[in-house]
A protein has these predicted regions:
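RNase H-like, metal-dependent nuclease domains and their acidic two-metal-ion catalytic environment used
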Residues: 15-16, 21-25, 39-40, 56-216, ...
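Acidic/polar active-site rim loop that often engages polyanionic ligands
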Residues: 219-223
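Signature of the SF2 helicase/ATPase Hel1-core->accessory helical subdomain module
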Residues: 1-50
Length: 318
């Protein structure tokens, strides 16, 4: 699906009509983009009540025949997900329904960058960033929030590390010298290094690493610029984001996040992961057909630091 797009670029129009079938696929992605103004499709939802020959008796008969899950999809027009999703689907659906009402005051890079609110004087802002590992299905992403949890800007796209660092610094300066927390694992270290050493940006978030050494009763500590993700703190920040979304303590406007949230599930070990991510082929190589969690991780980091939690503590092995 989508192979017709190059043909349409030379002229013509397209009407795509379907009942929702799953999430994260091409149709669902285009729908979410359309209601947020991110593409040229005009989203129209046609309800069964609009049909002149349908009444409540027809609906009840169909509901009995199809069952609740298929009724929701085929009759009510709801996108359904599979697996135990991390985020409350009622909350995510409410966010999706609000996308068409979101005001976007600036876009760049074909919609990869979206700004919703200008910086307000005297307001503290926070930027958390997830840095792409370079794999085909991996993106760099960031989110800008104020202390109250209102998201004022977001980005998700393919971008070299030096340009990503420049983009983060640009919006750090623009948003009142915001605290920037780039994930500093692996290739993310290059982004953090550029921010610190090339751009001389000083308002960086720091992680504290506790070094336990043999023969010493008192551990040593080391402050590391950027956000250092571990399996433990990853679960903590995702759990906090889930709770804040469920309790309406954070206002997310990012359509990329909503696309990812529908396919962000608990795996067999109860670990929150993007559906199909890190799945390995029979040959042992990582497959590139899974879904993404880049916007989710950027949001989780930003949400954590905007609460005034200025340092994350990591205990290093002996």
């Amino acid at each position: 699906m989508g192979s017709f797009i190059p043909t349409l670029s030379t002229g013509g129009s397209s009407i795509v009509n379907s009942t929702p079938y799953g999430v994260g696929n091409w149709y669902h992605q285009q729908w979410v983009e359309a209601i947020s103004g991110g593409n040229k499709f005009n989203p129209i939802r046609l309800y069964w009540q609009m049909h002149p020959e349908r009444d409540i008796n027809w609906y009840n008969d169909m509901a009995t025949s199809l069952g609740p899950r298929r009724t929701a999809q085929e009759i009510d027009g709801d996108f359904l997900t599979s697996g135990h999703t991390v985020f409350d689907l009622t909350s995510i659906k409410a966010m999706e329904d609000m996308l068409s009402e979101q005001r976007v005051i600036e876009t760049r890079m074909n919609g990869s960058l979206r700004i919703f609110e200008k910086p307000k004087p005297g307001t503290n802002y926070y930027i958390g960033a997830d840095v792409s590992t370079g794999r085909a299905q991996d993106y760099s992403a960031f989110s800008i929030m104020d202390r109250s949890g209102e998201e004022v800007g977001c980005f998700k796209g393919k971008i070299p590390t030096d340009k990503f660092a420049s983009l983060l610094v640009e919006f750090g300066h623009k948003y009142n010298n915001a605290i920037i927390a780039p994930e500093t694992n692996d290739i993310g270290l290059a982004v953090t290094s550029d921010i610190q050493n090339i751009h001389k940006y000083t308002n960086l978030y720091y992680s504290t690493k506790i070094l336990r050494k043999k023969g010493k009763s008192k551990p040593e500590t080391e402050d590391i610029p950027g956000w250092l993700t571990t399996s433990k703190n990853r679960s903590v920040i995702i759990d906090e984001l889930e709770e804040d979304i469920r309790n309406d303590d954070v206002w997310i406007r990012d359509p990329f996040f909503i696309q990812e949230a529908y396919t962000f599930i608990y795996d067999a070990t109860n670990r929150p992961v993007a559906l199909g991510k890190n799945k390995r082929s029979k040959g042992g190589e990582e497959e590139e057909n899974g879904y993404t969690d880049d916007s989710i991780m950027a949001k989780a980091i930003t949400n954590f630091i905007r609460k005034g939690k200025t340092k994350s503590t990591i205990v290093a092995p002996q």
